[in-house]
Design a protein with these regions (language model features):
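Flexible, acidic glycine-rich loops studded with aromatic residues
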Residues: 369-372, 380-517
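Contiguous, structured surface segment used for ligand recognition
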Residues: 7-10, 14-169, 461, 473-513
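Flexible loop/turn segments at secondary-structure boundaries
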Residues: 60-61, 182-184, 210-216, 266-272, ...
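Generic beta-strand/beta-sheet core signal
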Residues: 55, 177, 205-208, 260-268, ...
Length: 517
């Protein structure tokens, strides 16, 4: 891939069932839908005379410009010549930071495509990056292939339009479970690339669970030398060294994706308990487990060594992640009393804050005394909404809408269905603002699609359950509620098929969608 997206798989032939009516081909293939869009007559044609003007030496802006130039080269065979900053000559594509665009927020942008020129402005490098992703979706899908597919330059057109765009929510996230099954650095980088394409900006990594511990902790090396060696089913696991994890954090940051590390505490900890028996109340290491049962494990909350362990783990991971968050889990703890659980979470909250991070936890932590900076991630459809509504900050991941490891239907080979069957329409048609009655409007930070990996052995499995539902969640998180429409989304997501195919994405061809060739 280009500068904003690392690698492009080899081209794949379109699925033989992929068809599209002419109405689907006429839509603008933009997902998520921009906040404001006006179509105009005409189009801008990219030719060998087209130039690229970049009015900033900011490193992130330059990366976005290189990505755009590479996408143009792949889709047309044309190498854009550089033009002086601010050049307004016919045939110019210009990228410019503009303080007057601050009204669009930290991630907004304005894009004007006219027959004579293309202008992209934003107040921040992030805004320009997201504007480039919009242009990317308007370019031919051949821009996603790693090699130019033709010998002679082939002009391409961009439809004339005017877009002013900004996200509805600041938190537009995805969670990837690398604990039940391990995914390599390259796999996770690919997922980052796909998130960035769809303007998502958080990747929550579930780094430890009963079946495996996936990040090196130098003060507790047995966590990975023993606890990181397997996964669900007993197949070989793996882990990230601290250098690898730091590299992943940097890779994501270049694409305006913040990595949110999670170490689930005090439950979901059998991999840690089997590595260090002193973390158990009886001092005996349990056998490693590779099944998918939950709720049976817990750190010994009455031992001082437990909190030394947590402080060391949080400290080492916090040093690797410049983002402000640390996810401490807190879910499905069935072996503690409510009072034990409450005291534990509040003590962990203090540790996390001491390392300069905001604590995030699954919605069970709403029953404890939380600091105003702490964040509750709502996931249980049957959770007490009155309790959740009092949370100082909320991330919404309702399992019956946003758990994209659920099956699409009863025939889906992968995934689970304990929360619900989630066809694409169900992932799309919900309003975060009304999900938790009584929650303050400013308490809802945004939305996160969770992908647990009990049934997923490789990235093709991940992509099959993620797409197209991840695109639906991206639009729920970005686009204004009043602009969203299922039938309109059906046409636009169907138009993504050539791009996803070029990227090698193993997406589910939902039967309710007319997939473009």
């Amino acid at each position: 891939m280009a500068a904003g997206c690392a690698r492009t798989p080899k081209p794949q032939a379109p699925h033989p069932a992929a068809t599209a009516k002419s109405s689907a081909l006429r839509v603008l293939p933009l997902v998520p839908l921009p906040a404001s869009l006006e179509r105009h007559d005409g189009a801008f044609t990219i030719t060998p005379k087209t130039t690229l003007s970049v009015a900033s030496q900011d490193a992130a802006v330059q990366r976005s410009a290189r990505q755009l130039a590479e996408l143009v080269r792949r889709s047309t065979g044309i190498t854009l010549a550089s033009a002086p900053p601010g050049a307004a000559a016919d045939g110019a594509i210009s990228l410019r930071l503009d303080d007057q665009q601050k009204s669009l927020g930290a991630e907004g942008y304005e894009l004007t495509i006219a027959p004579q020129s293309v202008s992209l402005t934003a107040a921040t490098p992030a805004g320009l990056f997201y504007g480039v992703q919009t242009i990317r979706q308007l370019l031919p899908a051949s821009s996603e292939y790693e090699a130019v597919l033709f010998q002679e330059p082939r002009p391409a057109t961009l439809p004339a339009l005017h877009i002013r765009d900004w996200p509805r929510f600041a938190w537009r996230g995805a969670m990837l479970d690398v604990a039940r099954h391990f995914f390599s650095v390259e796999d996770v980088e690919r997922y980052v690339d796909l998130l960035a394409l769809h303007k998502m900006n958080r990747l929550h990594l579930h780094l430890a669970d009963d079946q495996g511990w996936r990040i090196e902790i130098k003060k507790w090396p047995g966590l990975t030398t023993k606890g990181g060696q397997s996964e669900v089913g007993g197949t070989p696991g793996g882990f990230y060294t601290q250098a690898q994890f730091a590299g992943l954090v940097s890779y994501a940051a270049d694409r305006f994706v913040t990595i949110v590390p999670e170490i689930d505490l005090p439950g979901h900890t059998n991999a840690a308990l089997s590595s260090y028996p002193e973390l158990n109340c009886n001092g005996v290491a349990p056998s490693p487990r590779f099944d998918t049962e939950v709720g049976y494990s817990s750190l010994c909350v009455d031992k001082d060594v437990t909190y030394t362990f947590i402080d060391d783990v949080v400290g080492e991971i916090a040093a690797l992640t410049p983002g402000p968050y640390f996810h401490a889990g807190g879910d499905e703890v069935k072996t503690l009393t409510p009072e034990q659980y409450k005291k534990f979470i509040e003590r962990v909250q203090t540790i996390v804050q001491a390392h300069g991070k905001q604590m995030i936890g699954w919605d069970e932590i709403a029953a404890t005394s939380l600091h105003l900076s702490s964040i509750v991630q709502h996931w249980r459809p049957d959770a007490a909404k009155s309790e959740i509504s009092r949370a100082p900050k909320l991330i919404l991941s309702p399992a019956d809408r946003a758990y994209i490891d659920m099956k699409y239907d009863d025939e889906t080979a992968l995934g689970l269905k304990w929360a619900a069957l989630i066809p694409l329409k169900n992932a799309y048609e919900w309003n975060p603002a009304t999900l938790v009655p009584g929650a303050a409007a400013d308490a809802v930070l945004g939305v996160e699609a969770a992908l647990w990996s009990e049934t997923l052995a490789n990235m093709r499995d991940v992509e099959f359950l993620a797409f197209p539902r991840l695109a639906a969640i991206a639009e729920v998180a970005w686009s204004p509620q009043e602009r969203r429409d299922w039938d309109d989304f059906r046409a636009r997501v169907g138009a993504q098929a050539p791009r996803w195919t070029a990227l090698g994405v193993n997406f589910f061809r939902a039967p309710e969608i007319e997939w473009a060739r």
